[in-house]
Amino acid sequence: MQDWTPREHYTAEDLVEIIRILRDGENGCPWDKVQTHASIRKNFLEETCEALEAIDADDPVMMQEELGDVLMQVVFHTVIEEERGRFDMEKVCREVCEKLVFRHPNIFASSAAENAGINSWDALKNKEKGRTTLALSLIHISEPTRPLY
């Protein structure tokens, strides 16, 4: 059993620590500690679809819950990678922060000179990745959500 003091306010760091505790090989939750990327892949997709349903419904209570579930999935997958020694939450956050700065040269002066003349998010994304992303080409993003499987 893990000592844990309930808090009035939780942070993203608390969420990471809770997932680490649940996955602890000795004292963790039997279900959580055996999960892999493949075994919880469907959960990630389901939680994402539920978050989109909440957004479509413009329901703030539902959005708060479902966005939390998506965040938990991101942290769960990240902790699996942390256990493998490949990356951790700090690296995930650094990656997305660097990406946002790079793709907003009109806002962040440090990236303005490097990206002068490129004025669209997609063009900056393609420059950054060196390719065009096709992930959303299979999804009708303008339509209300529906199961993808």
Please report, for each region that a protein language model flagged, where it lies by residue.
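Charged, compositionally biased N-terminal leader segments and the immediate start
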Residues: M1-E26
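Amphipathic, non-membrane alpha-helical segments in soluble helical-bundle scaffolds
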Residues: T5-A12, V34-R41, P60-L67, R86, ...
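Active-site flanking loop/helix segments enriched in acidic
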Residues: I21-E50, A54-D59
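An amphipathic alpha-helical micro-motif enriched in hydrophobic residues
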Residues: F44-L52, D56-E82, E90-C97
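Single conserved hydrophobic/aromatic residue that forms the stacking wall/gate
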Residues: I139-Y149
